Amino acid sequence: MYFLRLIEFLHYLCTMERILMLFFSIFITLDTFAQYYPECEDTCSHIHGIDISHYQGDVFWEKVGENAKMAYVYMKATEGATNIDAKYQHNIDMAHRNGLKVGSYHFYRPLIPQEVQLQNFMAQCRPVDQDLLPMVDVEVKNGMETEAFCDSLFKFLDLMEKAYKQKPLIYTGANFYDRYLLGKLHDYKVMIAQYTEREPILKDDLDFVLWQYTAKGRINGIKGYVDKSRFMGNHKLREIRFRHK
């Protein structure tokens, strides 16, 4: 009876070992797949980058910095009058430590006084910390008439230019541009968002510098989705470098 129980026990141990080995193999396989995502930058020669905010959670910047195909990162700093992205200061510090070219952006709220919004942005974004032009995220007009909205926006852009001694980069969607900003941004460098396989073509054929082509990109070091963008045509990273006097 003793030997039968011993044999049963040994059989049980062998079974558990096989189960554990199977589980371990599955875990390794899943982890391997989780670390590799065939993406647009794997199949083309354009210069690519990412846009992040606190929505990406904790970013493993060492992993992001190891990706030689990611040349730049824009990170949200502020929104409106008082909103400050909770991850901004940590993100910009860690991105610099890991060798990335960094720019900061402000989400523009047209109904809020421009001077107050600029103060919010400047309190977070020191020129010395910036590698790339400050960017203004223009996505909403909050029910304003188009003319009043544009007056509001360009007042803010002028204030931003005076504060940082260079014109900011403008981010907006292709449809938003065609409806409200058509023909008005030829003096600015522009990033256009359009999540399609084909490159955007704007109604006035604006020669925009950057294209944000997906909100569902993947990259090692960031859990979940991340916005990805790339330079258009022959445009280069030097065009959006922050000029330090």
Q: Model-found features: residue ranges?
A:
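Functionally critical loop-and-helix segments that line ligand-binding/catalytic clefts
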Residues: 37-49, 185-245
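Acidic-and-aromatic substrate-binding clefts and catalytic sites of carbohydrate-active enzymes
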Residues: 50-60, 76-87, 107-116, 142-147, ...
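Boundary/entry segment of secreted carbohydrate-active catalytic domains
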Residues: 35-79
